[in-house]
């Protein structure tokens, strides 16, 4: 159980390991109603395959109420199209009685009186999926490496459930299921929104940074985009593109160019 404002960090300890996650509105559960993450509602609202740190960062329930917000994501490769793995999916491939994430969910949620399901909707963290040119749903080895993680912030009091995927018959876990670690931080801890990037496949990830001007620009807009490892304003409130364009032509403007990663010095001594 997690309180509103607390943080939920799901960590891939050894790399290339999927983890299924879902959360429930705790207050609604006490009233006998089951409101959990709805991947279809979420994709429709954020306009992406899954939320990422930034503007389109929240997972919603079927009532379009936010349940968690993605604060940090070191890998950026997940899935919201497939269900948590099921007993049937293994039986169809000849593996009868195989442990699976949907049954794990049922077991973990039993004490809350939540209805059991043969196939659970879930946020399939680290699962590397896609749809190819023949409209076939594909799955390959995860991109995640040891220590990669996703950090969420609870938007309500929640009941959370997580299952390290036990799939050992496909590349989903590199054919070798390993441990997932879930850590909870109290609201008093502060985490900035960050996306992890690697310069190449062998590099450690680097998280998006706030520029030296962020404390001022963030008071003028919440519309930030990631640019070369920095959060940069995309637009400012109460103006719009035409007003900003006119200001560039006719007035003096100040721009945060930190993402260019260079200094510009002007004035009489600039060439010395």
What are the language-model segments listed below?
Residues 1-196:
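Acidic, Ser/Thr/Pro
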Residues 185-272:
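Glycine/proline-enriched, intrinsically flexible loops and inter-domain linkers
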């Amino acid at each position: 159980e997690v309180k509103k404002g607390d943080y939920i960090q799901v960590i891939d300890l050894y790399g290339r390991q999927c983890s299924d996650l879902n959360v429930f509105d705790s207050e609604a559960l006490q009233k006998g109603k089951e409101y959990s993450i709805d991947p279809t509602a979420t994709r429709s609202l954020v306009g992406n395959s899954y939320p990422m740190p930034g503007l389109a960062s929240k997972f919603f329930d079927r009532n379009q109420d936010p349940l968690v917000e993605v604060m940090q994501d070191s890998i950026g490769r997940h899935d919201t199209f497939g269900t948590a793995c099921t007993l049937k999916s293994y039986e169809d491939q000849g593996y009868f009685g195989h442990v699976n994430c949907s049954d794990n969910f049922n077991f973990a949620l039993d004490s809350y009186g939540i209805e059991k399901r043969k196939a659970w909707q879930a946020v399939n963290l680290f699962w590397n999926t896609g749809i190819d040119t023949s409209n076939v749903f594909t799955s390959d080895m995860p991109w995640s490496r040891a220590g990669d993680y996703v950090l969420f912030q609870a938007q309500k009091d929640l009941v959370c459930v997580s299952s390290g995927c036990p799939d050992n018959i496909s590349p989903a876990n590199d054919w070798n299921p390993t441990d997932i670690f879930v850590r909870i931080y109290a609201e008093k801890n502060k985490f900035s929104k960050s996306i992890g990037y690697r310069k190449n496949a062998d590099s450690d990830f680097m998280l998006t940074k706030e520029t030296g001007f962020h404390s001022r620009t963030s008071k003028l807009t919440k519309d930030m985009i990631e640019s070369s490892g920095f959060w940069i304003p995309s637009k400012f409130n109460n103006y719009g593109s035409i007003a900003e364009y006119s200001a560039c032509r006719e007035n003096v403007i100040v721009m945060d160019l930190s993402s260019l990663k260079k200094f510009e010095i002007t004035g009489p001594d600039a060439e010395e």
